[in-house]
Amino acid sequence: MTLHHVRRGTGRPLLLLHGLGGSWRSWSTVLDALAAEREVIAPDLPGFGATPPLAGEVSIATLADAVTAFLDEHGLRGVDAVGSSMGARLVLELARRGVVGAVVSLDPGGFWQGWEQVFFYDTVASSYHLVRALQPVMPALTGTAVGRAALFAQFSARPWAVPADVALTEMRTFAAGPSFIPLLRSLVHGPTQQGAPAGPRGATPGPITIGWGRHDRVCVPRQAARALATFPGARLYWFERSGHFPQWDTPEETVQLVLRSTG
């Protein structure tokens, strides 16, 4: 599977998988720091950024198939992997399948129950349609702290502090991905995430670290316990000052966690 991607740095490879509506640029706040220590491979997942959508079903399973094919194409099977949001669930699925090494899963989606599931779908779908409608004025909105505070209130603990260029890029990509709505529906209404088979470390090839923002308003913190129940060999790390995207709110802490957990 051909995925548009960037490769930076030298050293042991490290795969970065973005979230729903993102692209490789979603890692821009931590990319250079990670590339100073590792060779970073950051693809655009199918239907986002510069990678065309899949021909058929769009789901965690089919995205995992596509990423596995990409890893095989580039000789990267067994690579350490970091994921954010939907990408965080994706790296857990890849670990369950045994195709990646050490994993850092940042605020993974998919561990909601009851009202949380409805809340996730309704708020994210509403954000998508609003962002699409606001595209003509998006440069002005993302160019001010007040505008960023309004746009990113659900996603960041410090939305006004998200860099203006990062905010604009995210809002452009968020609105443009043809796979956004099909994947959102699949995430909410599709199969729940399976855990790893029983065994050492949950029978995954490498250790799993699940990072969660204490102020996550997308995947609320109570969901962390369910993620750990699904992957009982995982270690939980709390970002005390972060929302849904620790790479935005606490980039230095995120880099330290990734390097420490995959080293």
Segments from the language model and where they lie:
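Flexible "cap/lid" loop of the alpha/beta hydrolase fold
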Residues: 96, 100-136
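Short beta-strand/loop motif that positions the catalytic acidic residue
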Residues: 204, 210-212
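Conserved acidic catalytic loop of the alpha/beta-hydrolase fold
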Residues: 61-79
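Acidic catalytic loop of the alpha/beta-hydrolase fold
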Residues: 214-219
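Conserved alpha/beta-hydrolase catalytic His-Asp/Glu region
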Residues: 139-203
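Gly/Ala-rich beta-loop-alpha elbow adjacent to hydrolase catalytic centers
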Residues: 83, 87, 91
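Conserved HGGG/HGGXW glycine-rich cap/lid loop of the alpha/beta-hydrolase fold
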Residues: 6-52
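Catalytic histidine-centered segment of alpha/beta-hydrolase-like enzymes
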Residues: 239-255
